[in-house]
Structures are given as C-alpha cells and as structure tokens.
Amino acid sequence: MENTMNVPIRDVPGVTPKDQIRTKGILHFTIGVRDHIAAAKFYADVLSCNHIRSSDRYSFMECGGSFFVLAKIPHHVNPNNPGEDAHHHAFMVDEDEFDRAMAVLKARNIETFKYTSEGHHTFPGRHAYFHDSDGNCLEIVYLYPK
C-alpha cells in the first residue's frame, strides 16, 4: 500500500523503513458497549455476524472472515456527538444486499441518519450510517467495482 501521508517516511526524523513493524493485517478491533451479551445479539440479529464466544466481559464476533470484540464498559460514552459519524465501524455488503439491508434497518426501526452514494473518494460506493443498541456509529457499504 502506498504511503498517502503528507510526510514521506524518509523525512520523519529518526524513522527509517527498517525501523517499521511489518504487520500482516488486523486481527480484530474492539467496540465498547454497556452490555456485551445484548450487543452480541444485536450484531448477530441485525448484521448476521457470528458469535464465537463470550466471557464475563467480552463477546467475540466474526463477520466475513474478520473479527471484532464487544467489550463491556459499564460507563460507555459514545465517541461521536449526535449526528456525527467520524468514529464508526463499516460492514461491507454486496450490491444486491444493500437495498435489502436498508429495508431490514427500516423494518427494525433502526434509523439511518446519513446516506450517500457520491463524493467518497477513498471508498466509492453506497454508504448508510446508523447506530447500534449502545449508540456506536455503524456503516453498511457497497463498494463500487474498480
């Protein structure tokens, strides 16, 4: 992947390519929730994610070969202000699934507060934003073919 930062790596004082950690990918990300068991049910029921297992504090989930963890945080605070989507988690769907996904959200009375199909230069496609049961911002996206 190309370095898209404005500062070339060679210009960062004290950092050379040999100093970089060579990661292979992302194993999982973590989403803070008030009740990880209830949240696991939401993600399984609404987004068809697979529940792997739960402990006293965590629920481990899988979606399309990627993993995420729902962490019980009793005093969870939404990282976004109302109506904002800067901090969010995007779930990809196929083209024929996008409209069906929108209908599922509507049928479940889950409000989509933002929709766009134009103007996204990095990930062009159809994007819809909504909240999980804890107010975390989620996105469903169909990426246009390149």
Question: What are the residue ranges of the model-derived segments?
Answer:
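Short beta-strand/turn micro-motifs at beta-sheet edges
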Residues: 15-18, 75-79
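Vicinal oxygen chelate
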Residues: 1-19, 25-34, 62, 79-105, 108-146
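Core segments of cupin and vicinal oxygen chelate
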Residues: 30-69
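Short, charged/polar, Gly/Pro-enriched secondary-structure boundary elements
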Residues: 66-70, 77, 136
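Long, hydrophobic N-terminal alpha-helical segment
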Residues: 14, 18-33, 38
